[in-house]
Design a protein with these regions (language model features):
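Active-site anion-handling motifs in enzyme catalytic cores
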Residues: 1-329
């Protein structure tokens, strides 16, 4: 009996960011396969989030041992020099073994010139079966990389992934106005919130009668600044101290690791009347669920704003993106 050659997916999976696993779900729908595997640094967690995976691999050697028919390189912000240096050589080998290579829905970082690529590595990109990025900023950044192949724009197709409501049904009250809150506790965001506290307090006056739904999409394995539980707790303490929390268990990290998935998170967001978010893939969830979204971000970091621009033709009524100034130094 002939063995099925699987599709393998490369991305920043397993690190504790549900936005990346959301991109994996979308990629698996875009490239359906009888057997699909994904790279992950935490296979059990990734497979809980994406149960239709056949399995995970931890390195390029394990990927090549699967003898894939297709390699889908994506997973959100995987378009960086570091990621290319780590994986492009293995894509050359996979292509030589007969695999088709796809670059799908990339978020492109500050790449710089990719002149260090060998001719074979460059051809993997230039001859890819598909090459897409998620927004026009990614196109502009890619144009500076010195590669002749230019990508098409997807406009965050993961916005259309279906929500799962089991957790929302179990945890959230009915008949109560709900505000979802998602804040990343980076030093820059903390400084901006302190500096523009009066602006944020004025913004929060509208929500005095709302219960709070903590929207935690990331508890990173190794980066404390990427812990949304800490960001949410601090924001509620400073700006919404009198509002009840509709589901305090969502701030429990162990519960989060055991129960949250990308689609369950979208189910929580879909039940909110408004989502206040610093994190872009929560904005993507909210926009996809037709929930009013207020983006709040440091003005110097435009990643959230570019998400709003990419999805501007489908923003729910009343949505807006607010940039906060940092203190001058």
């Amino acid at each position: 009996m002939m063995r099925i050659r699987p599709t393998v997916h490369l991305g920043a999976f397993g690190y504790g960011n549900l936005g990346d696993e959301l991109c994996l779900i979308e990629a698996m729908q875009a490239f359906p396969s009888a057997e699909a595997y994904a790279f992950s640094v935490a296979p059990d967690w990734t497979m809980r989030c994406v149960p239709c995976l056949k399995g995970c691999f931890r390195n390029a050697g394990e990927m090549l041992a699967l003898k894939p028919a297709r390699v889908v390189y994506g997973g959100g912000l995987f378009g960086t020099s570091k990621a290319f240096q780590a994986w492009i050589p293995s894509l050359v080998r996979a292509k030589a073994m007969g695999a088709e290579v796809y670059f799908h829905n990339l978020g492109v970082g500050a790449l710089g010139d990719l002149g260090w690529l060998s001719a074979a590595e460059r051809s993997v990109i230039e001859d890819a079966a598909i090459f897409t990025v998620r927004d026009y900023v990614s196109v502009e950044r890619w144009a500076k990389a010195g590669i002749s192949r230019m990508p098409y724009v997807t406009h965050f197709p993961e916005a259309d992934i279906a929500p799962e409501f089991s957790l929302a049904d179990a945890l959230l009250p009915r008949g109560q106005r709900l505000l979802g809150v998602s804040i990343i506790p980076t030093p820059m965001m903390r400084a901006c919130l302190r500096h523009e506290a009066a602006t944020v307090h004025a913004l929060m006056e509208e929500f005095s009668d709302h219960a709070i739904v903590p929207i935690v999409s990331t508890v990173h394995l190794s980066t404390p600044d990427e812990d949304d539980t800490a960001g949410c707790i601090e924001f509620l303490r400073d700006f919404l101290p009198k509002n009840p929390i509709a589901a305090p268990i969502l701030l429990d990290r162990e519960f989060w690791r055991a129960e949250l998935t990308p689609q369950r998170l979208k189910g929580l967001i879909a039940r909110c009347d408004t989502l206040l978010t610093h994190r872009k893939h929560n904005a993507v969830h909210g926009i996809g669920a037709n929930v009013r979204v207020i983006g709040l971000h440091p003005w110097a970091d435009g990643s959230l704003r570019r998400t709003f621009i990419a999805l501007s033709d489908r923003l729910p009524h009343g949505s807006r993106c607010i940039g906060l100034q940092a203190p001058s130094t």
